[in-house]
């Protein structure tokens, strides 16, 4: 079934988001199962599976997600915060995603983050990527501006908008926004 994302979908989401607590809102989007579909652009790895079933996180799926979202520079694997996974699930549902998230950056080791801060502008020295609480991504078929808007409306954390680099940053830190 093809889902069409439009302004009406965002309006409905916007009307529901303030009145439902975040966990209750997540439950409204999925009855008994939360699934993620990911494609790491640096490693080529793909994953499409439920990570939460009937109120419990699935340990094997979480381990596989941690591996797919590892630091591609150092091959270091770290635990990804389940709140970030829940945020991705809610965003996927909000925009009616039919394709996997394309991952630019998931977990980032301190060594990789230091390298990026020295060679790239706009990289935070204390990035939430190093805690498994942030991700840079895009979603084929969904305009970046719509992905950004979904992140803003869900108020799950920080939303950075990088249209010149073709990605959106999402994290589960404090609610804030930056970028074009």
Say what each PLM segment does.
Residues 2, 34-39, 122-180:
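Catalytic cores and adjacent binding grooves of peptidoglycan-active enzymes
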Residues 54-104:
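Active-site acidic/histidine clusters and adjacent loop/turn architecture
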Residues 85-89, 113, 144, 148:
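Extracytoplasmic/secreted envelope proteins and their assembly/folding machinery
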Residues 110-127:
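Charged, often glycine-rich, active-site loop that binds/positions anionic groups
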Residues 100-114:
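Acidic helix-start/capping segments at beta-turn-to-alpha-helix junctions
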Residues 68, 87-98, 119-122, 140, ...:
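Structured segments of extracytoplasmic/periplasmic soluble domains
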Residues 22-51:
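C-terminal segment of N-terminal export signals and the immediately downstream linker at the start
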Residues 1-18:
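N-terminal secretory signal peptides and thylakoid transit peptides that target proteins
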């Amino acid at each position: 079934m093809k889902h069409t994302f439009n302004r009406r979908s965002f309006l409905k989401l916007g009307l529901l988001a303030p009145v439902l607590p975040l966990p209750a809102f997540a439950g409204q989007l999925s009855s008994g199962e939360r699934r993620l579909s990911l494609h790491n652009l640096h490693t080529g790895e793909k994953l499409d599976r439920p990570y939460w079933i009937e109120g419990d996180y699935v340990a094997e799926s979480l381990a596989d997600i941690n591996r797919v979202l590892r630091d591609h520079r150092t091959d270091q694997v770290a635990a990804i915060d389940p709140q970030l996974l829940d945020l991705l699930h809610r965003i996927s549902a909000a925009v009616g995603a039919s394709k996997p998230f394309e991952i630019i950056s998931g977990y980032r080791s301190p060594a990789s983050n230091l390298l990026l801060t020295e060679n790239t502008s706009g990289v935070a020295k204390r990035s939430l990527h190093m805690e498994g609480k942030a991700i840079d991504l895009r979603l084929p078929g969904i305009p970046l501006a719509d992905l950004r808007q979904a992140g803003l409306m869900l108020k799950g954390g920080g939303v950075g908008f990088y249209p010149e680099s073709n990605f959106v940053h999402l994290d589960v830190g404090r609610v804030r926004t930056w970028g074009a």
